[in-house]
Amino acid sequence: MTPADVEAMIKKIADGQSEKLNWQQSIVDLMKLLKLDSSFTARKQLAQELGYKGSLDGSAEMNIWLHKEVMTKLAESGGVVPESLKHA
């Protein structure tokens, strides 16, 4: 699945929600749409599990990196949320 396919799939999910989320830029909103725990603790744990090497302080850098990684993992798994993202 291409990144464009993933974006189209997520947009379709977002369009069906009453709450308007900024999933294109916000890892918290993206995780909410995917029904993943978007808490700070969960994001820190997921960043560690995915190999983030920077500070785990919830910085914009960490969140941007994590957003990119989640989108990549979705593309690699054919648009299905992989188990590795669910348990964080």
PLM region spans:
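Amphipathic alpha-helical interaction segments
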Residues: M1-A88
